[in-house]
A protein has these predicted regions:
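Active-site/pore-lining binding-face segments in mid-to-C-terminal subdomains
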Residues: 248, 256-328
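Short acidic, glycine/proline-rich loop/turn micro-motifs
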Residues: 24-27, 100-103, 147-150, 255-259, ...
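Acidic/histidine-rich catalytic cores of soluble enzymes
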Residues: 7-14, 146-268, 356-387
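Active-site-proximal loop/turn and secondary-structure-junction residues that shape catalytic pockets
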Residues: 18-20, 56-58, 91-96, 139-143, ...
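Residue-level preference for long, well-ordered alpha-helices that form the structural scaffold
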Residues: 29-33, 65-72, 109-113, 148-159, ...
């Protein structure tokens, strides 16, 4: 019987805001008792997680005094040590406080933009104190409901200026952060800048330090836009910009549901795990997901265990797919190579172009049947556990 227990090598992490979510939503209040960061660390230690991530105010309330901050940090460090947890990633809450109701780095108000930088610098210090090496930027309020309210070109310029500033700040302070940008098409704003992961992949080369910057794609956010998440992650991998990843699940075209990983679209989750494992992704596998609102405290533990267990099961099934003789024979069959033609098309040269123009390629003969139904059915049988 395979072992599906959490493997430390997988670097499974959860945010303080995930398992600590008391179940409130826009239509109803809290349904579970709020638990402290120390209690969350104890919970994650119990279920076998590798680490925990946080926004600055998940750990330290925005109005905490310096002595209160120091005590919170001290207590949390002890809880991390007691539970053998690490903090791989930190981020800033630039969306909850009323000051950010119309944006943070992209706000029309220079004082708000300055406060956003100040708050982020302090949050970066907090993350560095816990050893975080990835710093995520999710622009929760960076957007509009009406384009009459802000010039989108200026908004992008403002965002670039802020990131350039913070890159230099990280270098100056010796934090050695890698920045990871997280896209989302809407919610809480009606329309959000950098709506999908590809938006950030296009934006990063324009920065002063593109080598420091990558992406943190999230399953739910790309599904909200109706996109194939595996393809978004593949683009990030190919660009060498997959610095972090948020795993959860989501029905297409809905509000941000943040379901338990693999609970809504199992086939998509399978191909995601296969992609990450096939390409040797070595970063954190962060479950930015939430237990059902109906769950009690014990069921929240089941939720956390379920996220990790599903990943481990799909990892095993991906390995089985890769070694299934019938599947691999089909893969070989559908990938038709011609060494001479491949050599000609790999890099342009005038001579190569002439040879390709003169090549006797029969378009009618190229219309061949492909066994894709069979391949997909075999894939489904692997996922369903009958192969």
């Amino acid at each position: 019987m395979p072992n599906y227990d959490p493997d430390p090598k997988m670097k499974f992490t959860f945010g303080l805001w995930t398992v600590g979510n008391p179940g409130a939503d826009p239509f109803g209040g809290v349904v579970r008792e709020r638990i402290s960061p120390v209690q969350i660390a104890n919970l994650l230690g119990e279920v076998g997680a590798y680490g925990v991530n946080f926004h600055d105010n998940d750990l330290v309330p925005i109005d905490a005094t310096p002595p209160q901050r120091d005590q919170i940090v001290k207590d949390f460090k002890k809880a991390l040590k007691d539970n053998h947890l690490v903090v791989p990633m930190a981020t800033t809450n630039l969306f909850s406080d009323p000051a950010f109701k119309d944006g943070a780095f992209t706000s029309n108000n220079a004082k708000v933009r300055a406060y956003a930088l100040q708050k982020t610098m302090r949050a970066m210090e907090l993350g560095a104190e816990f050893g975080a090496k990835i710093y995520v930027f999710w622009g929760g309020r960076e957007g509009v409901e009406s384009d009459a309210t802000r010039n989108p070109v200026e908004a992008i310029k403002r965002f670039r200026e802020a990131i350039n500033f913070l890159c230099e700040y990280s270098i100056n302070k010796g934090y050695n952060y890698k920045f990871a940008f997280e896209a989302k098409p809407n919610e809480p704003r009606g329309h959000m800048y950098f709506a999908v992961t590809g938006s950030y992949l296009a934006f990063i080369p324009s920065l002063d330090h593109p080598e420091m910057c990558g992406v943190n794609p999230e399953v739910a956010h790309e599904h909200m836009a109706g996109l194939n998440f595996v393809h978004q992650v593949a683009a990030a991998i190919e660009a060498k910009k997959l610095f972090h990843i948020d795993l959860n699940d989501q029905e297409f075209g809905r509000y941000d549901q943040d379901f338990r990983f693999g609970s809504a679209n199992l086939k998509n989750a399978f191909f995601l795990v296969k992609l990450l494992e096939d390409y040797g992704y070595n970063g954190s596998r962060h479950f930015d997901a939430h237990a059902y609102r109906q769950s009690g405290s014990e069921d929240v533990k089941s939720f956390a265990r379920g996220c990790m267990r599903t990943y481990m099961i799909l990892k095993e099934k991906a390995a089985r797919w890769n070694t299934d003789k019938e599947i691999q024979a089909l893969i070989k069959e559908i990938n038709v190579d011609d060494s001479e033609l491949s050599k000609l098309s790999k890099k342009f040269a005038a001579s190569n172009a002439k040879k390709l123009l003169d090549a006797p390629l029969d378009r009618v003969a190229l219309n061949i049947g492909l066994p894709y139904e069979k391949l997909d059915q075999l894939t489904m049988e692997v996922i369903m556990g009958v192969r």
